[in-house]
Curated annotation (Swiss-Prot):
Entry keyword annotation includes Cytoplasm: no
Gene Ontology biological process terms in this record: nucleotide metabolic process; purine nucleoside triphosphate catabolic process
This protein's UniProt keywords: Hydrolase, Magnesium, Metal-binding, Nucleotide metabolism, Nucleotide-binding
Residues binding Mg(2+), per UniProt: 45, 74
Protein name listed in UniProt: dITP/XTP pyrophosphatase
Catalytic residues as annotated in Swiss-Prot or TrEMBL: 74
Transmembrane segments: none
Subunit annotation: Homodimer.
Length: 220
């Protein structure tokens, strides 16, 4: 495992919601953080067929363009009744004809498909969020960290705090959707903690432990 040394770190994302979450997760570690959005760098075409491939495409492009290590996330919603869709195409399902993204439309699309399949009870609406974080260096070397969280899709959407599909995702064991949770509730992790809730926080926890050598408390 290649360790990440303190210094400048590029977050390879133009997604405002992801950038807010990364800012909260990376903040305690003392890196000089910038994003490809702030630097005006273009988004590479995500031509991969897995979360790992797309995360690498984004992180490597940012690392090569800036000369600094870059951190990216490729994430998505996988719905059991839809054979794992939308998966790596989660963001694509929200694309409109004018090139923008409408996640209200995307959530409705998922719900329509579930209704068509008769998936109206919680046991038929199981899903998971997946996040793969890629840390890439300008020389092309990379490390990967994967996090997943299981849950159930609810309808109608609940809450407007999060982004993307958060308002319809109810994580197992909780009474709030991600869209109803504060950032602290959703991520449920800070350096040294034993556990994390969200898929991105779980992936980031692995990144912190393996690439930054952060020691977490043992899980109870």
């Amino acid at each position: 495992m290649r360790m990440l040394e303190k210094g400048k770190l590029i977050v390879a994302s133009h997604n405002a919601g992801k950038l807010r979450e990364f800012d909260g997760l990376i903040g305690p570690f003392g890196f000089e953080v910038s994003s490809v959005a702030a630097l005006g760098l273009p988004e590479p075409d995500e031509t991969g067929t897995t979360f790992e491939e797309n995360a690498y495409i984004k992180a490597l492009a940012a690392a090569k363009a800036t000369g600094f290590p870059a951190l990216s996330d490729d994430s998505g919603l996988m719905v059991d009744a839809l054979d794992g869709e939308p998966g790596v195409y989660t963001a694509n399902w929200a694309e409109t004809e004018d090139g923008k993204r409408d996640f209200d439309m995307a959530m409705q699309k998922v719900e329509n498909l579930l209704q068509e399949k008769g998936a109206t009870t919680p046991d038929k609406r199981k899903a998971r969020f997946v996040s793969v974080i890629c840390l890439a260096w300008p020389d092309g070397e990379a490390e990967y960290f994967r996090g997943e969280v299981e849950g159930t899709l609810v309808w109608p959407p609940r809450g407007n705090i999060g982004f993307g599909y958060d308002p319809v995702f109810l994580p197992d064991g909780y009474g709030k959707t991600f869209g109803e949770m504060t950032a602290e509730e959703k991520h449920g992790w800070k350096p040294g903690d034993a556990s994390a809730l969200s898929h991105r926080a779980r992936a980031f926890k692995l990144f912190a432990e393996k690439a930054l050598n952060v020691v977490s408390a043992p899980a109870e």
